[in-house]
Structure formats: C-alpha cells, structure tokens
C-alpha cells in the first residue's frame, strides 16, 4: 500500500493511541500506585499491521503490485485494527431450554364486519354475502298478487293439489321476468344486426362503397352500427366476438375537427384529444394519416391553410371545420365531405398508374349523373332519412314488446324450479295478464340496471358535491361583495360623523367666543345639530356708474347673489357718509321666521355716538367675523333692551318714529315684520339698504376709496330721502357740518333690494347734492319721519 505523501514510519504516524509494541495503561496511572496494581486496557488497537502494509515513496515496485490511496479526507485506516484486549478471559455461553408459553388471544374478530368472498365458507358461522344476495328474491308480492294467490289456493284445494306459498310465487315471477328480459335483448340485437347486415344498400362509412372482397370484409360496430371495410378503418384482424369502433370503446361521441358532424368512423389525432372522420382526413389534401395500415393517427391538421378554414359550406351553410372545393376547373364551390356524402354528390376515387390515389369531388351542379352510368340508381339519390330509420326501428321494438310472452318458455322455468307444469302455467297466465295491463312494461328492473344504480349514487354524490362547492363559492363571493359594501358604507358614515363632530366643535368654540365677548347667542346648539347650516353668500357690490337720468345702470334681480326684499335679515338706513356692511343672503330662514310670526330684532340708537348693537338672527355668518365687523362690546346691551318694548306695538306698527339725538350716528327705523305679512305691497317700498360699520382696522385702508365713492352714495341716498319727505316737509338742507372725509368705511350702492323699483314708482327722487355730513344727517331724519307718516297714511 502506497500513500501520496512523504514517507513516514510507524513510530511517527502511530502517536494518537497506544501501540502494541509496549505495555502501558491507556489512561495512565495515579501517582503512588504500585506497578502491579495497574489496570489492563479496555481496548487494544494494533497499528503495526497497517504500518507493515505501507510502502515508502522511494520503494520502486511495479504499479500492479500495490494500491494507491488517493483519498485523504478521512483517514480511518490510521487508527489501526482493534484486537482482543484479554483473549484469555473470553466468556463461554450457557444455554438452557425453557418451556414454551401458550399464546394469548388478544384480538377477536367480530362476525358482522367480516365478509367471505369465496364460494364455500372456510369457517363455521361465516356466510357468503354474494350467495345471500343471489338467494334473495327481487320480486315482492303486492295486494293484487296476494288476493290472486288466495283465489288460486282455493281452486287448487278444490282440485286436490297442494297450495302455493308466497315465496314460490315470488321466485316464479322473478324467473319469468329474467328469462323474458334476456331473450328480448337477444332478439333486439339479432333484429338490428339482420336489418343492417342483410341490407342491400349498406355501404362503407369511409369509401361509400357497398362491395366487399375476401380479406377486406365489411365490419359492423355492435354499439353504433357503423359499417366499415377492414382496410378503410385499419382493422388488422376481425375479432371473433363483438367489435366496437374507437369512439365506442372509449364511450364518447366527439365532434369532428374537420366538419360539423358527430358519429361515424372516426380516428383521433396524435395527441388523442381531437377526433376527425377518416373520410374527411382522406379527402382534404393537406391532412394525412401516419400509419396507413391501421389508419391512425390523423396528422398535419395544422398544415390546413386559413383560407380553407374560412370557407362556408354551400350545403349546410356553416363555417365550421374545413371544406373541399369542386374539382371542375373554374368552379370553387365549397362543401364539407360528410355533407357531400349526405347529399349524394359525386365523389370519385381514381387509382393512377403509379399506385397513387386521387380524389375527385364535384359540387351539386356538376355531379348530375349521366345517362347509362352504372351504380347511380334513383334509389341511391334518395336514401332513407334518419327519421325514417328511427321510426322503423321504433316500430320493430314495439312489435317485440307486444309479443314479449313468446320469448318465455314455461317448461324451462318449471324444470329449473322443480314445479309442476300445470301449476306454473297458472302463474304464467297471471304474469302475462298483469304485464299486459301495465302496457307491456317489465315488472322488475333489469339486474344490470340495479347494479348500475348502486354505483350511480356515488357518481351523483360527486357531481352533487361539486355543484354544492360551486354554489358555495358563488355565495361566498356574494358575501364578500356585501362585506365590502358594508365596510365602505361604514367608512363613509365614520367620515361623515367626524366631519359633523368637527363642525359641532367649531360652533361650540364660536359660541364660547361670543359669550365671552358679551354678544347675544345667535343660534342654539340644537339647531346646529339637527339642521344643516345655511349657505352663506357674501355679496359685496361696488357703486355702479349712474346713467344720465339719475338711475342706476344695474337692475335688481332674484338670483342667488341678489338679496330679495322679503329675505333681508334686517333693514337699516345709512349711519353716516360712506358707512355700511356687506349683505348676507339668507332667504329661506327669513321666510320661515316670517311664517312662524317671529319678530326680527329691532335696531336701537345709542346716545353715546357709538355703533348701535344689532340683534342678529341665525344667519350662518361666523360670529367672530360678525363681532369684528361690528366692533361692539356688551356694555350697550341693556339700554337697547330697555327701549325694545316702546318701539313695537301689538298691531305690528311702530308707536312713533325713533328720532336721532346725536348727529354723529344714525339708525334706521325697521318696519315690523307682522305688517309685512298683512300688506306686502305697502312694506316693499320702505326697505332701505342695510348698512353696518366696519371695524376700525379697515378705516385707514379704505379712506382713500371712500372719498371718491361717498359723494355718489350720498347723492343717491339724498334723492331717496327728499322723495319721501316732500309731502310732509319742504325744508331744504343747508350747508354745514363736517366734511365727508371723516367717513370710516365705504358704502355699497343702494340697489340691493327687489323693492327699489316699486319704491321709485311711488316716490319721485329729487333734491340737490349735499356735500357735508350735517346736511345728510338732517335729510336722514326727515326720511325717518316720512317713513312713519307714509305708514300711517297707507294703512
């Protein structure tokens, strides 16, 4: 033995375990222990045997005399060979024979779970299930049978014969039914075979030829009754018994790949998943058959061009499969091969000199038979239809069923059951009469059908379970859709609730700010919770350019941004030159207040020259902005409440006009809304443009704009005031007072009400332009007196 490494001796390589060249303790000895008390080793390995087999690399011998160790991954051979540590103390085995214990039976076979399928029972107490099933009678007597049996026994007693028990009659009825069923099936098969095999017009389903020769006989399928030649269908050897075609062997009825017909002599493709008629494969030029001897499989279907697949048959008018065309030159009428056979078109098979077969097909126009052409009799052009064949077959079957009793031999039944012939004849006549009364139907189902019914529930259960799983999956899909819709609806509801919560928190915050500022609460929390907040439309109009006749160029309207006279929250006259507020459009809530008879808050005049506090209904306007525009505090609230009872009388008419005692501030008198309900036409002309003060923070930003716009606004308002005050006062305003430059806001044009055209029709506007604040204040005072007088006059 030779290794691929440096030469080593046994001393250098045997250093991992004790060697046999010296006697030593494997585990060593404790200090102080005498040498005679040393323990013997438990295991002994000899490495000298391995070392003796090693050869140094310098040893020159032939390669055939040693083995080369090339695997150095796990060197187990370095450990040596284990030998006996104490060969003198080998234990000797001692053996003795003991008596065999009896076996305990731990399992007992229950008889009801054990079935014996053999013919003869092997153990006592066991029975054969098949024998029991065969011994059981399948026919059960009904009430009519029992009554007839009693009458028969009475007659037999009078005749001196023995009585017939119920079991004997049941066995006789079963034997008659079984023999009738077997003989009728054989007769039906024989009749069908005779009707096909001995038919003179029967032809091969492939070549359409009625002739046969020795070695190429015509074979009939025992299930579908097709007739083919041996060579046409590839039958190498005709079987002795029944013969079935390929489709009947598999029990399928596939559709042809090349035509729309089903049934007939068909063969499968190479994959075995698609089928085609052998005749279609022969007549279509692109398709071929791989093995001509067996005429299968059908190949090269993919070589059919798309133009052939797109042809429409001229006979069946279908675009299914591949069509062939007429062989006449310049005639391209397409038709299926099977359709041509059904319509008896001329289909020729020509054998050339080079043993090549050519197929010639002709359309309906070119396949007219010539005079004296053999093989084309009128009967061949009008073959019996499938309906005629089925009706003839049904007629034969009906004749067989009507003569069912002729297929029963009572002598054989009496011999098999060991019964007297005259006794069995009674039962036979009764059986015939009972079956006749049942429209010649069998009294027992065939035994084969019962065996199939035993397997049918299992198949039905599989289909039922598959159908159940399909419906279950559909139901689960519906549940999934419903769950998705419910979750989506709940998410939308959650988002809506969060939005309502945010709106409520904002309203609470604004109410708290209003209460802390000392302002009256404009709306209740309940209205905010149960009613949607009104739509806020903020309309800021700049003064319009006046026309030459002194009228405004803009027209009043009823749009969403144009306030209506019946929907004004409150109406005030000008509080000063260029002072005003934006209009808030809230028609729907104002109409509801008018219908419910709620009085709008009156506008009171403060004597200290400040802006009069306004009691505002729910307008949808942010209260913080409302407070900022007013710039008011809660110190003027008590004075206004004290004067409220004096302004409004029970009949809805002001007691007296409210006069202005301080010329630095003007307040407009507001007409009672109850007077508006009683007379809308009277109140429509007395609405003035509602104006409010802006906060002081807006004064400096708008002072330059107000200087130019106050003059136009003052002229318009002065003409309105002079028009109302003409019937009662002829006093002309005089110059004096402060200039209009002290205005602290701008004034929108006065045309913010739908009632202005009506007011213009009643009152003619006039007067001179007043440029000073004092004159404007006097004019406004006269206007207020005019309102009061006009109201009283019109009432």
UniProtKB/Swiss-Prot annotation:
Zinc finger feature spans (PHD-type): 201-251, 311-367
Q: Which Pfam family is an annotated match for this chain, by its short name?
A: EPL1
Name the residue ranges with Low complexity bias. 1-25
Comp. bias intervals (Polar residues): 678-687, 720-732
Keywords, alphabetical? Metal-binding, Repeat, Zinc, Zinc-finger
Q: Please give the SUPFAM superfamilies that the UniProt record associates with this protein.
A: FYVE/PHD zinc finger
Q: Offer one example of a GO biological process linked to this entry.
A: regulation of transcription by RNA polymerase II
GO cellular component term, pick one: histone acetyltransferase complex
* Zinc fingers, C2HC pre-PHD-type class: 253-287
The intrachain disulfides are: none
Q: Which domain of life is it from?
A: Eukaryota
Q: Name one GO molecular function term.
A: zinc ion binding
Gene3D superfamilies, per database record: Zinc/RING finger domain, C3HC4 (zinc finger)
Q: Where is this region: Disordered?
A: 1-41, 630-654, 667-687, 714-795
Cite the CDD domains for this sequence. ePHD_JADE3, PHD_JADE3
By its UniProt entry, which InterPro entries does this protein fall under?
Enhancer_polycomb-like_N (IPR019542), EPHD (IPR034732), Histone_Mod_Regulator (IPR050701), JADE3_PHD (IPR039550), Zinc_finger_PHD-type_CS (IPR019786), Znf_FYVE_PHD (IPR011011), Znf_PHD (IPR001965), Znf_PHD-finger (IPR019787)
Q: Which family does it belong to?
A: Belongs to the JADE family.
Q: How does it assemble?
A: Component of the HBO1 complex.
What does the record give as the function of this protein?
Answer: Scaffold subunit of some HBO1 complexes, which have a histone H4 acetyltransferase activity.
Protein name per its UniProtKB record: Protein Jade-3
Which species is this record about?
Answer: Danio rerio
């Amino acid at each position: 033995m030779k290794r691929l490494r440096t030469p080593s001796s046994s001393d250098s390589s045997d250093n991992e375990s004790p060697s046999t060249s010296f006697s030593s303790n494997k585990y060593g000895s404790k200090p102080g222990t005498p040498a005679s008390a040393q323990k013997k080793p438990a295991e002994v390995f000899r490495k000298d045997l391995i070392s003796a087999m090693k050869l140094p690399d310098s040893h020159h011998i032939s390669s055939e005399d040693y083995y080369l160790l090339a695997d150095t991954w796990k060197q187990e051979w370095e450990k040596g060979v284990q030998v006996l540590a104490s060969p003198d103390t080998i234990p000797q085995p001692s053996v003795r024979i003991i008596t065999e214990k009896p076996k305990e039976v731990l399992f007992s076979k229950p008889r009801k779970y054990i079935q014996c399928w053999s013919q003869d029972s092997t153990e006592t107490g066991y029975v054969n299930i098949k024998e029991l099933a065969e011994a059981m009678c399948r026919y059960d007597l009904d009430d009519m049978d029992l009554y007839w049996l009693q009458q028969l026994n009475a007659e037999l007693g009078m005749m001196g014969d023995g009585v017939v028990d119920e079991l004997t009659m049941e066995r006789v009825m079963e034997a008659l039914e079984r023999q009738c069923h077997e003989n009728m099936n054989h007769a039906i098969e024989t009749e069908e075979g005779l009707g096909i095999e001995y038919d003179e017009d029967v032809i091969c389903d492939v070549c359409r030829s009625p002739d046969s020769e020795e070695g190429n006989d015509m074979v009939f399928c025992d299930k579908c009754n097709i007739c083919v030649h041996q060579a046409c269908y590839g039958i190498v050897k005709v079987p002795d018994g029944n013969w079935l075609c390929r489709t009947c062997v598999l029990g399928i009825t596939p559709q042809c790949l090349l035509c729309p017909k089903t049934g007939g002599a068909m063969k499968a493709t190479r994959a075995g998943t698609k089928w085609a008629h052998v005749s279609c494969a022969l007549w279509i030029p692109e398709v071929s058959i791989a093995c001509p001897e067996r005429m299968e499989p059908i190949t090269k279907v993919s070589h059919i061009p798309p133009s052939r697949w797109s042809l429409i048959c001229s006979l069946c008018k279908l675009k299914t499969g591949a069509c062939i065309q007429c062989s006449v030159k310049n005639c391209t009428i397409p038709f299926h091969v099977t359709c041509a056979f059904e319509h008896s078109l001329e289909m020729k098979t020509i054998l050339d000199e080079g043993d090549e077969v050519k197929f010639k097909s002709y359309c309906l126009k070119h396949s007219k038979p010539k005079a004296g052409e053999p093989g084309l009799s009128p009967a061949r052009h009008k073959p019996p239809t499938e309906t005629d064949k089925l009706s003839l077959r049904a007629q034969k079957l009906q004749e067989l069923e009507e003569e069912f009793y002729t297929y029963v031999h009572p002598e054989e039944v009496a011999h098999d059951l060991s019964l007297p012939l005259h006794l069995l004849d009674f039962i036979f006549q009764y059986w015939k009469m009972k079956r006749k009364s049942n429209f010649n139907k069998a009294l027992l189902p065939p035994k084969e059908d019962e065996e199939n019914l035993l397997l049918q529930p299992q198949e039905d259960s599989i289909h039922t379970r598959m159908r159940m799983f399909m419906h279950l999956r559909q139901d689960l899909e519906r549940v999934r859709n419903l769950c998705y819709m419910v979750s989506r609806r709940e998410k939308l509801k959650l988002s809506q609730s969060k939005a309502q919560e945010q709106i409520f928190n904002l309203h609470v915050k604004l109410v708290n700010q209003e209460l802390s500022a000392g302002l009256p609460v404009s709306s209740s929390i309940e209205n905010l919770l149960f009613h949607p907040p009104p739509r806020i439309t903020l309309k800021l109009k700049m003064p319009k350019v006046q026309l030459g006749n002194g009228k405004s160029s803009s027209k009043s309207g009823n749009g969403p941004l144009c306030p209506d006279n019946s929907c004004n929250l409150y109406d005030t006259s000008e509080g000063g030159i260029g002072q005003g507020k934006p209009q808030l459009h809230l028609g729907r809530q104002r109409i509801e207040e008018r219908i419910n008879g709620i009085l709008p808050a009156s506008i009171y005049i403060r004597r200290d020259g400040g802006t009069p506090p306004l009691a505002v209904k729910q307008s949808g306007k942010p209260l913080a902005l409302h407070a900022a525009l007013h710039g008011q505090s809660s110190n003027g609230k008590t004075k206004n409440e004290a004067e409220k009872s004096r302004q409004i009388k029970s009949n809805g008419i002001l007691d007296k006009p409210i006069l202005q005692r301080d010329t630095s501030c003007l307040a407009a008198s507001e007409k009672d809304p109850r007077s508006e309900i009683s007379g809308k036409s009277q109140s429509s002309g007395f609405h003035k443009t509602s104006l409010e003060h802006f906060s002081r923070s807006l004064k400096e930003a708008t002072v330059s704009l107000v200087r130019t716009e106050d003059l136009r606004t003052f002229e318009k308002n002065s003409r309105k005031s002079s028009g109302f005050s003409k019937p009662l006062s002829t006093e002309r305003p005089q110059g004096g007072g402060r200039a209009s430059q002290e205005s602290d806001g701008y004034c929108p044009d006065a045309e913010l009400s739908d009632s202005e055209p009506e007011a213009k029709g009643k009152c003619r506007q006039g007067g001179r332009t007043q440029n000073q604040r004092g004159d404007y204040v006097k004019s406004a005072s006269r206007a207020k007196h005019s309102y009061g007088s006009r109201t009283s006059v019109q009432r």
